[in-house]
Amino acid sequence: VRVKTMSDNTVFKTELEERINKINEQIESYLPEEKGHQSTIFEAMNYSVRAGGKRLRPLFMQEICRLFTGEVQPAVVPFMAAIEMIHTSSLVHDDLPCMDDDMMRRGKASTWAEYGEDMGVLAGDALMIYAFEVAAKAFNEVSEADDLKRVGRAIEILAAKTGIYGMIGGQTVDVELSGGPVPKNKLDFIYRLKTGALIEASMLIGAVLGGAAEEDCKIVESLAGKVGLAFQIQDDILDVTGDQKVLGKEAGSDEKNQKTTYVTIEGLEKAKKDVEILSAQAIEDLNKLPGNNEFLENLIRILIKRQK
């Protein structure tokens, strides 16, 4: 049984804000300078990343690393920036007219709405590639053979979970099935890849760079899968029940696009119940891991109850 030392919500929220501010500074330090003939692409990239967001993926990465080492290893920081760039690139492409056709993102005009559809495509591409350039900087932070291997493995995880067997694979099935009925097994597949894969990457990279044993990495991946699924179901719930001002994006976007979601298949009540079950199972997984990171436990709990 863990001792609750951060049960006070105000303490947690202050801590969360401080950690997100630090992450924003770290991400900022890797963003390109807006100069040269191609400065428009730099502006569009930076606009997309600076639009805000919860910074969940870098947060998960550093907190899982902290679980195994008690601190955030320097090699983790470039990966934290990289995963947020990849996540942002997926949002930039998601909003395009040929995809979800959304004009708003994170409370501002979406990237294509601000810079044009052509720049929206290029900015998404640029962020995804630049992310790997940034991640590779982690090699400069380590010198031991084992640590160098870990950085190599982390890059492999990042690529696999972003690409055809991960996020892009999930988006492919999502696009192909949009506008028509989607069977539950395919919806689970889409969620596991489209949302789950990057959350798995963030936690797994944190574990690998934190020197976690193989069996612990498996638990981390299982934990991340549950958090990812719960997160996406909550997203579906908020699309039905949420307030556009709070969400910072168009509520009812799923209905507008006639999208099958967890809520349309299972109903609102069952969806809410499943989110609670998944989060409880995720906390169980977390409790199997060494170390104690109560902040991470609170973060998982609060995410499930989020309103945006």
Language model: regions and residue ranges:
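Short, Lys/Arg-enriched N-terminal segments with co-localized hydrophobic residues
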Residues: 1-5
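Short arginine-rich
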Residues: 289
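Charged, compositionally biased N-terminal leader segments and the immediate start
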Residues: 6-14, 27
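Mg2+-dependent prenyl diphosphate-binding active-site environment of isoprenoid biosynthetic enzymes
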Residues: 18, 22-286, 294-304
